[in-house]
Structure formats: C-alpha cells, structure tokens
Amino acid sequence: MSSFHATTIFAVQHKGKSAMAGDGQVTFGQAVVMKHTAKKVRRLFGGKVLAGFAGSVADAFTLFEKFETKLEEYGGNLKRAAVELAKEWRSDKMLRQLEAMLIVMNKDSILLVSGTGEVIEPDDGILAIGSGGNYALSAGRALKTHAGDHLTARDIAKAALETAGEICVYTNDQITLEELE
C-alpha cells in the first residue's frame, strides 16, 4: 500500500531570529501529487515553538500530538521534550512503526528528532529534512554564510525552500513560513 509523503522542511536561526519553512506538496506513492497546499509547519505551545515534519502525514500528526504533550509535561523545555519524545518513539512498539522526521525549534534552539532515537542540534543553526532537504540545506548554508545584514532568517528560509522547489520533484512552491522573534 502506498503512503503519502515527500516534502521539504527547512529551519534557520539567524541574527537572533528563527524561521521555519515547508512546501505544500503531498505525494501519493511515487507518481501522484494529491495536494499542493498542505501545511507541514505548525506553531505549538502557545506559538512559542515551531515544528515541521517530513514523512507520512498521519504519522506526523501523531508525533505532533505526542510532542505537544511532552512540551506541556516539561513546561516548554524544548530539549527535554524532544529527548523524551525520541525515547518514547524508539521504545514504544507502536510508535516505532511511524515513518516521519521532525524539526522543532524555539527562539533559542533548533533540533532534529527521529524515530531512531536521535535528537540533533546543529552547529550552524540550520536544519533541513525531506526529499528536498539537501538542496535547501545547501542553499541555506550559502545564504546564511554570505548574508551579513542583508537577509533575515525569514528571507533565508524562503529562498532555501524556493531553491529546493526548483530542483526536487517532490517539493513545490506553495511555502508555509513561520518566524519566531
């Protein structure tokens, strides 16, 4: 049975601000675009946390709910909530079946959370996941390195997603962009 997947999520911290962008394409199997305007980036915990997913849509919704519960349980402590989610995701027989990855961020931290138990904080304040993730990551790193005062975190996130959308067939130009200050 085919699943709904394929996307690009990009997140960056730059000059004291954080931005996350995701495209809107949902692909069924390897050949059919089912939706162009999906929202894969969300605000959680009263708007103080951004979360984006790549992978199975149904699995991602389950993980969003679990992560938000962990945020509430740990008083908004992003790192603790991410570690506890990763531990549960890896150890729970049912959750282990979920096929998705998350990027979560607040104004201070950005983390990749995976079902294999990884919680990774990048050295450079940039993360990207999904089918177009490597394209977005490359574009974002170049832009951040050479941006100086000319580009904001929002500008970098938007341009990185646009670049990925021009290259990756599973990424489109219907971008959802959220920013934290």
Curated annotation (Swiss-Prot):
Pfam families: Proteasome
Any one GO biological process: proteolysis involved in protein catabolic process
The entry's keywords: Cytoplasm, Hydrolase, Metal-binding, Protease, Serine protease, Sodium
E.C. number(s) listed in UniProt: 3.4.21.-
Gene3D superfamilies: Glutamine Phosphoribosylpyrophosphate, subunit 1, domain 1
Alphabetical list of SUPFAM superfamilies matching this protein: N-terminal nucleophile aminohydrolases (Ntn hydrolases)
Domain of life: Bacteria
One Gene Ontology cellular component annotation held by this UniProt entry: proteasome core complex
InterPro entries reported in the protein's UniProt record: ATP-dep_Prtase_HsIV_su, Ntn_hydrolases_N, Proteasome_sua/b, Proteasome_suB-type
Location of the active site: S2
UniProt keyword annotation of Transmembrane present: no
Binding-site residues, Na(+): G165, C168, T171
Entry's localization field: Cytoplasm
MF-aspect GO terms: metal ion binding; serine-type peptidase activity; threonine-type endopeptidase activity
Family recorded in the similarity comment: Belongs to the peptidase T1B family. HslV subfamily.
Its biological purpose: Protease subunit of a proteasome-like degradation complex.
Subunit structure: A double ring-shaped homohexamer of ClpQ is capped on each side by a ring-shaped ClpY homohexamer. The assembly of the ClpQ/ClpY complex is dependent on binding of ATP.
NCBIfam families: ATP_dep_HslV, PRK05456.1
Name of this chain's protein: ATP-dependent protease subunit ClpQ
Gene designation: clpQ
